[in-house]
A protein has these predicted regions:
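Intrinsically disordered, low-complexity segments enriched in serine/proline and basic residues
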Residues: 1-2, 6-14, 20, 26-31
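Low-complexity, intrinsically disordered or signal/transmembrane-proximal segments
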Residues: 17-18, 38
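N-terminal capping segment at the start of a domain
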Residues: 34-75
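A non-catalytic alpha/beta surface segment that caps or lines the substrate-entry region
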Residues: 63-109
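Catalytic-core environment of secreted peptidases
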Residues: 88-92, 104-137, 142
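General beta-strand structural signal in soluble alpha/beta enzymes
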Residues: 96-100, 120-122, 162-164
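Acidic/histidine-rich catalytic neighborhood of metal-dependent amide-processing enzymes
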Residues: 127, 137-235
């Protein structure tokens, strides 16, 4: 998916980082991150056991008896997974909202409300028989940061937003990155009468999720409102 959509991904990266599109992205190993974090820096550790518990709970939203699972965008399983994810933030007292593109966004305020938000997240929708951790790890990583900050009684200077992007995989209608593209203000090639793999129109599917095809572009964010975007991604 990334190789086939490199041009669009470059544009998304340029939006979040306020820099021209780059031909390559630097890879940083976990060991390097760990070494840097120990060089006199103030840091806290997340509860890995709790993260795994959350991942297993989300996994059940779409799990099949044969051990595989599917959480297709806009499906009952996708909705359930998002409801479970929202529940974690509700317990923390962190408000959530859904924008016009269906992106689920939780926001933890910082100490300086004038600063742009640090955005962390990924997606929860999957391809058929998808990977257990694909996308979900990025979402849970953002949740873990919020849980840890609250547990430690800390706050960031910047607001922290955890986002679950809508329809990243694009399996249902044949085109992905809808939520992130809408948030970045990309031109969207979507139409009310587009048919999904089950023969349902996009309008029908969107309305079933409380969305409107005509209003998806309203999810566009001002680049100045986002300080940076971080995604923890595997698989």
């Amino acid at each position: 998916m990334f190789l086939g959509s490199l041009s669009k991904m470059d544009k998304l990266l340029s939006f979040f980082y306020h820099i021209p599109p780059m031909p390559t992205v630097k890879k940083i190993s976990i060991l390097e991150i760990m070494r840097n974090s120990q060089k006199g820096r103030d840091y806290v550790e997340v509860d890995v056991k709790k993260v795994m518990e959350h991942l297993n709970e989300i996994y059940q939203c779409g799990a099949k008896p044969d051990g595989t699972f599917t959480r297709m965008a806009y499906s009952r399983e996708d909705k359930k997974g998002r409801e479970v994810f929202c529940g974690y933030f509700e317990k923390l007292g962190i408000p959530t909202r859904v924008d016009q593109a269906g992106n689920l966004i939780a926001r933890m305020e910082g100490t300086d409300p004038s600063l742009p938000a640090i955005m962390v997240g990924s997606h929860l929708d999957t391809v058929p028989d998808g990977g257990k951790y694909d996308g979900a790890v990025g979402c849970m990583g953002g949740l873990a940061v919020c849980e840890t900050l609250i547990q430690e009684g800390r706050k960031l200077k910047h607001p922290l937003e955890v986002v679950v992007f809508t329809d990243e995989e694009g399996f249902r209608f044949g085109s992905g990155l809808l939520g992130s593209s809408a948030l970045c203000g990309e031109e969207l090639d979507i139409h009310p009468e587009d048919l999904d793999i089950e023969g349902k129109t996009r309008r029908e599917v969107f309305e079933g999720c409380g969305m409107s095809v005509e209003h998806v572009a309203g999810a566009k964010r001002d680049p100045e409102s986002i300080h940076c975007f971080i995604e923890l991604h595997v698989e």
